[in-house]
Design a protein with these regions (language model features):
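Short glycine-rich substrate-engagement loop in P-loop NTPases that contacts/grips substrate
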Residues: 49-77
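Conserved catalytic/switch belt of AAA+ P-loop NTPases
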Residues: 93-114
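Accessory nucleic acid-recognition modules appended to NTPase machines
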Residues: 178-261
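Hydrophobic anchor at the beta1->P-loop junction of P-loop NTPases
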Residues: 25
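Short regulatory helix/loop adjacent to the ATP-binding pocket of P-loop NTPases
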Residues: 120-135, 151-152
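Hydrophobic positions on the alpha1 helix immediately C-terminal to the Walker A/P-loop
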Residues: 36, 40
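Conserved lysine of the Walker
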Residues: 33
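N-terminal pre-Walker A segment at the start of P-loop NTPase domains
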Residues: 1-15
Length: 261
């Protein structure tokens, strides 16, 4: 039987409540958001429509069409609309706001659950249009107890491979594991998340910062030492800024030095 994280029960509880808020599953890439939603839907007793938005193809009109289909399911009682990868729909948050408010005025019990692989783009949409209309359900990196129970990780394996469930079966073949992590986690997180948060004038420097900084996980390293390993490209302010963006994207972050003053 597939392992179920705690957030599966949270999702189940929320979608079985009366319609109050849009539920949004948010978290770093490759942490099992879609899987958790699918597991929760297995025990959902009302009609539901589950769709996946596609980059470059799913338009605002497509989103409206899915919503109208779901409204038909809610004609005689509660129903649920699930939209995965909603960040691929241009201007998605304002479209969702309009449709959600229409349902509220009509007294329609259409519940809505949204997910997306880009936590940063989801958060951007929430800040723009949906204030007061949503609740977040966190999908964090997997903890050591979860990885130990689900995949048989030792503590050393967890510290080395991290809390990424999709990559866990590949850990015996480190080259294959690394290719997967680069293609599915690292590069998308840098290009589609971190670089979308703020202007990045030197994308290659950000990539180099990650590749140089990652081996220092859990260790002290100064910005000046990092700069030296980056061949003195950039400056400490740029490095600090890029590190913050990588942290917001959920792949690498730094701890500030403690100052009792």
């Amino acid at each position: 039987m597939a392992y179920k994280r705690h957030n599966v029960s949270v999702i189940m509880e929320r979608i079985n409540e009366q319609r109050r808020f849009i539920q949004i599953v948010i978290g770093p890439r490759q942490t099992g958001k879609t899987t958790a939603v699918s597991q929760a839907l297995e025990d959902f007793e009302h009609p539901f429509l589950s769709v996946i938005a596609t980059k470059g193809e799913s338009t605002a009109d497509w989103l409206r069409a899915q919503w109208y289909r779901a409204r038909q399911l809610a004609g005689s009682g509660p129903a649920l609309l699930v939209i995965d990868e909603v960040q691929f729909v241009p201007n998605w948050s304002s479209v969702v706001k309009t449709l959600w408010d229409e349902d509220a005025q009509a007294g329609l019990d259409l519940r809505v659950l949204l997910t997306g692989s880009s936590a940063t783009l989801i958060q951007e949409g929430l800040d723009e249009s949906l204030a007061g209309r949503f609740e977040l359900i966190e999908s964090t990196h997997w903890t050591y107890p979860e990885c130990a129970e689900a995949f048989g990780y030792s503590l050393d394996e967890y510290l080395f491979f991290g809390g990424y469930p999709g990559a866990a079966p590949l850990r015996r073949d480190r080259r294959r594991w690394l290719r997967y992590m680069n293609a599915s986690v690292i590069e998308p997180s840098i290009v589609n998340d971190a670089m979308r948060l703020s202007e990045v004038r030197n994308p290659e420097l950000m990539r180099r910062l990650f590749s140089v900084g990652a081996p220092y996980s859990g260790q002290e390293i100064s910005y000046r030492k990092l700069l030296g390993q980056l061949d003195d490209r950039g400056n400490t302010a740029t490095i600090a800024h890029y590190l913050k963006l990588l942290g917001d994207a959920g792949i690498m972050s730094g701890l500030q030095k403690y100052d009792p003053k």
